[in-house]
Regions:
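Short, flexible loop/turn motifs enriched in small residues
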Residues: 1-3, 14
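Active-site beta-loop-alpha junctions of metal-dependent nucleic acid enzymes
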Residues: 18-41
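Acidic/histidine-rich, metal-coordinating catalytic segments
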Residues: 43-55
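A short acidic (Asp/Glu
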Residues: 55-61
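RNase H-like two-metal-ion nuclease catalytic core shared by retroviral integrases
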Residues: 75-98
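C-terminal domain-tail junction helix/linker
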Residues: 102-163
Length: 163
């Protein structure tokens, strides 16, 4: 069974990056944190994870030098009560699992299913916790038109591929 690790912005619920691994608690997910930092263009102020050791190890590898200068907090002992929890991430994991079950799992690391789910989650799906707005809309990225999928496809087809 393959495991999906993902990064999500807490305020906007924007799915930033993902990594597929063969193991759940021992995979090196440092590349995930580094990719998230590159995509966001900056290091986060707080990283909220569960208590798995590989999250702490990856946090140290990806942010340790910056941690001293930028005071990045790593909260890894989350609880369901209170304002420090990872329920938003767990909800997204459930959303992914529901879809993955139907197609019988993620077979490859570069599965197009994951990119499609990421696009749907960020640009098409309205979120109840965001008052019906999309994650992209909350982040200030607007997709105009009635059919957001069609708009995204049309815009993608206009883009020139990178060499």
């Amino acid at each position: 069974m393959r495991c999906l690790y993902a990064l999500m912005d807490d305020q906007t619920r924007f799915w930033i990056a993902q990594q597929v691994a063969d193991t759940k608690y021992t995979a090196d997910i440092t590349p995930l944190f580094q990719e998230g930092k590159q995509i966001a263009g900056k290091a986060p102020s707080t990283v909220i994870t569960d208590g798995a050791y590989n999250f702490n190890s990856a946090f140290r590898h990806a942010f340790w030098r910056e941690n001293k200068a930028l005071a990045i907090r790593h909260e890894r002992h989350v609880r369901f009560q209170g304002d420090l929890n990872n329920q938003k991430m767990e909800r997204m994991n459930g959303e992914i699992r529901d879809r993955e079950k139907i197609i019988r799992g993620v077979k490859r690391e570069d599965s197009p299913l994951l990119k499609g789910l990421q696009i749907y989650h960020n640009y098409v799906r309205p979120h109840m916790g965001l008052n019906g707005e999309t994650a992209a809309g909350k982040a200030g990225i607007r997709v105009e038109g009635k059919d957001k999928w069609l708009t995204i496809i049309q815009n993608a087809s206009k883009q020139k591929p990178k060499d």
